[in-house]
């Protein structure tokens, strides 16, 4: 598309904003009244490459002050989005908290597809929420936004963050809930731009007033960098690794699901074909292929859907039978070839 087609009155500039773009044209530089390329005084235009050819065009609108480019605060079309927002919280389903969060998101992005991972996280159990995210988030399409609110530090000095990792976006408190997505390639930003929040922010409900609107803007196409400043020290939860000794592997229970299965931190590839699994003084001979491989009431060990060693009790709860919970030691004893 030629420059002459953009020979309109001087555009209205919106400082510190990136402008909406759509696929189609090749020139995005604004023009002066004489048709010369203006030097755009905004980070948004600089970021998009003023004066350079691109496969993008900007939407021109006419306002009270003349022609200009229609702005969408912090938005661009370079980052793909799936339109999906997942929700994880400890809010349960008897109160209106989850509904309020969804209402805020839909007010910003009515086309969003909202998927509940779980709202039954035990109250303030950050580790539990982190496990749910780790075991589900990356099954969603790239460009999905994952909103997680298990936030015992709400209203305190704990930071609010958004991050990008492995093609996905995460929004929530900086309390370790996103530990498993923090790596060398991830990018984390402090949420400190109030224009992306609700007008009035409650000290007790950042899920509704900060995280929900940010998630809505991200899913709609907001640029991650526009949400705040980069940080390089997001909080991480401790992640105990199994210890491999000459005669055994020593690990621990990291999650208990609603069936009472004890999920450990021992991956399948570490477990030899001949072994005995020991927990709380009880020995389980070898691995079973599935949950019904032993009679009802008999403990068994197997590799679960996450690829980790589990202790299960057919038709009952292994956690209740053993009175075991997260942190409980589990050993895999090597019994020879």
Locate the predicted segments by residue.
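Active-site histidine-anchored catalytic micro-motif
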Residues: 84, 108-114, 125-131, 140-143, ...
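Anionic-ligand-binding alpha/beta catalytic cores of soluble enzymes and soluble regulatory domains
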Residues: 198-265, 270
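A conserved acidic, glycine/proline-rich C-terminal tail/linker
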Residues: 263-323
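Short, low-complexity intrinsically disordered segments enriched in A/P/G/S/L with frequent Arg
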Residues: 6-8, 14, 29-31, 39-44, ...
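Polybasic, lysine-rich low-complexity intrinsically disordered segments
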Residues: 5, 18, 34, 47-48, ...
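N-terminal glycine-rich anion-binding loop in soluble enzyme alpha/beta folds
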Residues: 82-120
């Amino acid at each position: 598309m030629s420059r002459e087609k953009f020979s309109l009155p001087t555009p209205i500039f919106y400082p510190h904003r990136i402008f909406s773009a759509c696929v189609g044209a090749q020139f995005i530089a604004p023009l002066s009244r004489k048709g010369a390329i203006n030097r755009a005084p905004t980070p948004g235009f600089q970021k998009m490459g003023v004066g350079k050819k691109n496969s993008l065009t900007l939407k021109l609108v006419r306002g009270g002050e003349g022609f200009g480019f229609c702005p969408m605060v912090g938005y661009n079309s370079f980052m793909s989005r799936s339109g999906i927002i997942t929700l994880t919280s400890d809010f349960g389903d008897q109160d209106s908290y989850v509904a309020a969060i969804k209402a805020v998101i839909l007010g910003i992005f009515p086309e969003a597809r909202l998927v509940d991972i779980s709202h039954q996280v035990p109250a303030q159990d950050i580790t539990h929420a982190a496990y749910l995210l780790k075991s589900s988030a990356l099954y969603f399409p790239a460009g999905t936004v994952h909103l997680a609110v298990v936030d015992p530090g709400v209203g305190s000095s704990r930071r609010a963050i958004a991050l990008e990792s492995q093609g996905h976006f995460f929004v929530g408190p900086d309390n370790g809930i996103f530990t498993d997505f923090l790596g060398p390639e991830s990018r984390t930003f402090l949420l400190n731009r109030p224009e992306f929040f609700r007008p009035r922010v409650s000290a007790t409900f950042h899920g509704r007033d900060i995280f929900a609107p940010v998630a809505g803007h991200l899913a709609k196409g907001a640029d991650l960098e526009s949400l705040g400043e980069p940080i390089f020290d997001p909080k991480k939860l401790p992640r105990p690794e199994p210890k491999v000794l000459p005669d055994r592997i020593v690990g621990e229970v990291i999650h208990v699901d609603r069936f009472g299965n004890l999920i450990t931190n021992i991956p399948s590839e570490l477990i030899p074909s001949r072994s005995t699994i020991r927990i709380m003084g009880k020995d389980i001979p070898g691995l079973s292929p599935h949950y019904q491989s032993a009679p009802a009431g008999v403990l068994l060990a197997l590799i679960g859907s996450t690829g980790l060693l589990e202790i299960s009790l057919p038709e009952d709860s292994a956690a209740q039978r053993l009175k075991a919970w997260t942190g409980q030691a589990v050993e895999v004893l090597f019994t020879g070839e």
